[in-house]
Amino acid sequence: MSQDIHAHRILILDFGSQYTQLIARRVREIGVYCEIHPFDMSNEAIIAFAPRGIILAGGPESVHEADSPRAPQAVFDLKVPLFGICYGMQTMAEQMGGKVQGSDLREFGYARVDVVGKARLLDGIEDHVDDDGVLGLDVWMSHGDKVTEMPAGFHILASTPSCPIAAMADDARAYYGVQFHPEVTHTKQGLRILSRFVLDICGCAALWTPSNIVDDAIATVRAQVGSSKVLLGLSGGVDSSVVAALLHKAIGDQLTCVFVDNGLLRLHEGDQVMAMFAENMGVKVIRANAEDKFLGRLAGVADPEEKRKIIGRTFIEVFDEEATKLQDVKFLAQGTIYPDVIESAGAKTGKAHVIKSHHNVGGLPEDMQFELVEPLRELFKDEVRKIGLELGLPYDMVYRHPFPGPGLGVRILGEVKKEYADLLRQADHIFIEELRAFDWYHKTSQAFVVFQPVKSVGVVGDGRRYAWVVALRAVETIDFMTARWAHLPYELLEKVSNRIINEIAGISRVTYDVSSKPPATIEWE
């Protein structure tokens, strides 16, 4: 490697905001490596991390609470540029000698801030200029407390009628604070503001690019693996597909993939995976046809959590059987991505709440003595997709909708039967086919069909049909934490419904799910 793409790095300290990962994604989008760490990161770890700049993210707490989080002292001792966002601005102000008070008027949502001072952070960045020459920015606010007195050395940079110190600056030390959220798209100039801080003020070079990431990952894998053999569980999903392409480019025939066909995949999915990787790319792929084993274990089981656990355990068992047939495999590759790493760290603090168990929780048997290779563990999902394109994977594969690990097992409500899976596969295929035909597939974030174990009367020709009911589900979302049901055109819904009922004899009725998240989850189980 000619350059270290991690050398110019930003540290983001997390105080519990729902937007913290969004800040990191924006910084990466700018082309600079960054990491998220908890606000109580040790002073030694901060110094060892050697950031070019530090961002103090937002959070739900009030600085007035006795045990509210504080920034570590090393943040100030390092004397690198500092950017406090929302709560990050408030704790920064108070820790440096300023004052923060609760506000009678809380601000949530759109606001316009007037840029009333000068500083490098906002110089030349505005949305409006009023008749008096005052510059304005359209921003997204979400706060109750506000800074009422700035620490020594700071001046007011921006204000609103209810928040006179909406932004503050100390150019001499390159310390800045904003009460709004530059990381959300509602703040129109947010990316420019973050770019100004990261590139201009911190002096970072934009080294974090897809081609550089691929080169770096290949070099890292080769250094870790040497001439040893690597095993990968290939699912056909985006993450494992990108890992397969990346490892194949890095180590060629040292990689063997195991594709477990559990009988709960989408229509023709197994054949498509084999065609893409084994035939087109020349990757060594073992296909384990385990439909009977999976469906046998699931017989009579209706509880969603139990179904997930059975599917997870059976996958591990089948994978283990195939792995033991291979000789001299030293490494196991996984498609772990950065949000998994962050969530795992969060779970260790005891603050995480399990809504649904992940299908691979529990991992592989302890007697499988593999070392892990996780080439995507530094990457967000959007970065993984860009890497996939960089590696030559087809756009439609890289930008395919998410598919749950347990597959159709959690899209068939109640007991899973082969009959139900076959009907659901056909219905789902029709729905996706028509979404593409109407140019709605990439306008939705996730779309699928759910099989409901209830029958309904229908009329076909002169005959009466008593058959199964399915529900269509399509949502739009940025982060999958919240989602809105997709307002699909009636013509599209009508076409899908007519095709499903006319082409699939076992289905008599089609419904459309108009529930958003929250309160509903995206998947039904």
From Swiss-Prot:
- Which UniProt keyword terms apply here? ATP-binding, Glutamine amidotransferase, GMP biosynthesis, Ligase, Nucleotide-binding, Purine biosynthesis
What this protein catalyses is: XMP + L-glutamine + ATP + H2O = GMP + L-glutamate + AMP + diphosphate + 2 H(+)
Gene Ontology cellular component annotations, sorted alphabetically: cytosol
Q: Which Gene3D superfamilies match?
A: 3.30.300.10, 3.40.50.880, HUPs (3.40.50.620)
User: Which PANTHER family does the record cross-reference, listed alphabetically?
Assistant: GMP SYNTHASE [GLUTAMINE-HYDROLYZING], GMP SYNTHASE-RELATED
Recorded hits in SUPFAM superfamilies, A to Z, give: Adenine nucleotide alpha hydrolases-like (SSF52402), Class I glutamine amidotransferase-like (SSF52317), GMP synthetase C-terminal dimerisation domain (SSF54810)
What CDD domains does its record include?
GATase1_GMP_Synthase (cd01742), GMP_synthase_C (cd01997)
Provide the function of this protein: Catalyzes the synthesis of GMP from XMP.
As recorded in UniProt, its EC number(s) are: 6.3.5.2
Q: Name one GO molecular function term.
A: GMP synthase activity
Per UniProt, what is the name of the gene that codes for the protein in this document? guaA
Active site residues per record = C86 (nucleophile), H181, E183
Q: What Pfam families does the entry give?
A: GATase, GMP_synt_C, NAD_synthase
Pathway given in the UniProt record: Purine metabolism; GMP biosynthesis; GMP from XMP (L-Gln route): step 1/1
- Please list the residues that bind ATP: S235, G236, G237, V238, D239, S240, S241
Q: Which residues form the Glutamine amidotransferase type-1 domain?
A: 9-207
Q: Which residues form the GMPS ATP-PPase domain?
A: 208-400
Instruction: Specify the protein name.
Output: GMP synthase [glutamine-hydrolyzing]
